[in-house]
Amino acid sequence: MAGHSHRSSLKNGHKSYKSKHASKGALKRLYKGKVEKEPVGTGKPDKQVSKLQRKNKAKQLRAQRILDSIENRKLFEGKNGAAKIITIVPLVNDLDPLDILYKLLKCADDEGIMVQEVDSKRIFNVHIKKFKSNLKIIIPDMTNFLNILDCAKVADFVVFGLSGVQEVDEEFGEQIIRALELQGIASYIGVISNLSAVHEKEKFQLDVKQSLESYFKHFFPSEERVYNLEKNSDALNVLRTLCQRLPRSINWRDNRGYVVADFVDFVETSPDSGDLVIEGTVRGIGFNANRLVHIPDFGDFQLNKIEKISESSQKRKIIKEKATDSLSLELDLQTVFESNMNRDTLDEYAPEGTEDWSDYDEDFEYDGLTTARYDDHGFLPGREQTSKKAAVPKGTSDYQAKWYLDDVIDANEEEEAEQTNGKDETMMEIDDEMMVEQDNEEVAGDEEYDIEDNEGFEELSPEEEERQLREFRDMEKEDREFPDEIELEPSESAIERLKRYRGLKNLYNCDWQVDEKDPSSPAEWKRLLRIGNYKNTKNRIIKETKNEAQAIAGDRIRMFIRFPKFLLEKIQDPKQLLFAVYGLLLHEHKNAVVNFSLQRWEQYDKPVPSQEPIVVQYGVRRYTIQPLFSQGSNSPNNVHKYERFLHPDTVSVATCIAPVDFTQSPAIFFKPSPTDAKNIELIGHGTFLNADHSRILAKRAILTGHPFRFHKTVVTVRYMFFRPEDVEWFKSIPLFTKSGRSGFIKESLGTHGYFKATFDGKLSAQDVVAMSLYKRMWPMPSLPWNGM
């Protein structure tokens, strides 16, 4: 059939019309009902920057980065340049760190390196002529987990040894990697020293090498490969990297001065003490003779003087430029710096008698209370109670503020009521009415439910009372609604047990005095270091330390440390075991209320209760602390809920009294454990947050009762208290229920602690009546941990 054609099997629609500009009607339909939002500005006019100015600024920043890099490289250059510190850490047992070192040095073809010297020492200096570089090699004690952390702490490079035969143990080798990552690691390299044990031919070694590279990249994604030290080219590349690459910095470590001792000597100046002489090269921001130093496992000490043996390359350049200025030249050529009257003391607390007790309420005494404290004040006899202002939105006038009620502002005050606040009020009333009707039908004639308000109250016999109480508590244990719930024994007085607790309308909006009068507060509370603004103070102190440094990075010095004679027996040969000295910043030896962020270690599944002794390593210190755990929330009044346990998968705040740290260093929490392969159990990790004495921790206690009889909104409650005087004492504290109702105690009934309560709606028989009480938890002092 000529001219016949079939329909296309593909349907292609026409292109939609795309106008260049939308019509007015389309724009109206698009923006219908929307209100134009005024832009929020800073109040400053926008400064127009031309393209040429932007290019010039970028050029200046690039030039400054290059200049900083050149200055940092000068630290390690030259004959007297500082040695790069290399720590060798094998991750498996079948590797010998000395074998790794021997294969690295062998490729240098340097006859000046003595292998016998390598075999006899664990810490030594090596000069690589081929790359004109100095290296300080540290081989840690692989049986001591903390010594590995200490050696990696001062290292510029960490060389991780991997095995082609043995897998990395999750309980030891992998924990080393994770701990070093959390502590802070400068630069790292992965090497394999026994790949030939897999197979003699290289092509059969490839799979194992790729598997190890994948494993290493899992922890260090920026590292593309691991090196086979049995190949001379790979070993040479590793050595070249160690000698020529500029190591990354660790902020918290490099913001203080530190020295790895080459020589240690003691000069006796009195029968009980003398000068511990440390010789080494300065790293970090430097030292000042008026500041204290810290020696791990020994403590804090004062400096008597600092002697310079040789200048750093940076300082020699500065001296050369200042040769025309005689005064500056004289200061720069000074080689001995002695401490003076302005040096820091070793006092951890402020002297006694300097406390300021003006903030304390002298009239307040717990023994003078006639009822429970509510909203941060106690009802004292003959004392006027000041009215508190309600929190209102910003910009509200005094007249408008009168219309804001406390119950409206604090509607979300209780954590248990949050899950029900979104429910519709009408539906809640209908449900309650239906529930009450259903209960009344089911228990018709039951003596436990009283419909008549004027029906007489009958007390149960002691045996029946005990039986019903036992049944109620057995049922309660099956479904605990409130984690902070406490139970009172029938013979126990609620007044005596909960006398220091108070009621609050809203925990995060209350007015809680920081320096309140409390017999349970630490004796040294008013003598602690108090910092108004931690962040600004930290920046100022670090800046001042850099400017006041008398010995800077690269200087070779002798430090004369005032040292007691009885500690000499603990000092070991610095060529066999790492001996490091760290400079302390101003005020860092003083105790303060410090806060750590804390997250549980993934592999640790044991409970960690508050106030249990644990060891924390933060920065250069290790302390045994008894931390108080709290929620890491940001509350406007700096009052936070105390937590009894460290919960998994959450970040908590640990509070204690310990020396302050101005470098915001990472923290590792652990417990000594002789049965563990590492001799310690890693509990958690975090960061030093701040030093804040105004952070208040409130421990919550929830008393629960059983709704016993109902009449409209009046309910008879039992099992919350067991004495009528307890009911009268806590009568001022509001009540709440698990369904979101709120109420108050109306009157006490009988002698067994029953009481009538009025609520803002009807309750059901399945409801639980509760009362929240709060008590201040005070941080506890800490002690240095010496590894025992």
UniProtKB/Swiss-Prot annotation:
What cellular-component terms does GO give this entry?
Answer: 90S preribosome; cytoplasm; nucleolus; nucleus; preribosome, small subunit precursor
Q: Where in the cell is it found?
A: Cytoplasm; Nucleus, Nucleolus
Q: Name the segments for region: Disordered.
A: 1-57
UniProt entry tagged with the keyword Nucleotide-binding: no
Q: Does the keyword Nucleus apply?
A: yes
Q: Which InterPro entries match?
A: AARP2CN (IPR012948), Bms1/Tsr1 (IPR039761), BMS1_TSR1_C (IPR007034), G_Bms1/Tsr1_dom (IPR030387)
Q: What is an example of a GO molecular function annotated in this UniProt entry? A: ribonucleoprotein complex binding
Q: Which GO terms describe its biological process?
A: endonucleolytic cleavage of tricistronic rRNA transcript (SSU-rRNA, 5.8S rRNA, LSU-rRNA); endonucleolytic cleavage to generate mature 3'-end of SSU-rRNA from (SSU-rRNA, 5.8S rRNA, LSU-rRNA); maturation of SSU-rRNA from tricistronic rRNA transcript (SSU-rRNA, 5.8S rRNA, LSU-rRNA)
Q: Where is the composition biased (Basic residues)?
A: 1-32
Question: What's one Pfam family here?
Answer: RIBIOP_C
Biased segments, Basic and acidic residues type: 33-49
Q: Which PANTHER family match?
A: PRE-RRNA-PROCESSING PROTEIN TSR1 HOMOLOG, RIBOSOME BIOGENESIS PROTEIN
Q: How does it assemble?
A: Interacts with RIO2.
Functional note: Required for 40S ribosomal subunit synthesis. Required for normal export of the pre-40S particles from the nucleus to the cytoplasm. Its subcellular location and association with pre-40S subunitshifts from mixed cytoplasm/nucleus to all nuclear in RPS19 disruptions, suggesting it acts after the ribosomal protein.
Q: What else is known?
A: Present with 1390 molecules/cell in log phase SD medium.
Q: Which family does it belong to?
A: Belongs to the TRAFAC class translation factor GTPase superfamily. Bms1-like GTPase family. TSR1 subfamily.
| Name of the protein in question | Ribosome biogenesis protein TSR1
Record the organism: Saccharomyces cerevisiae (strain ATCC 204508 / S288c)
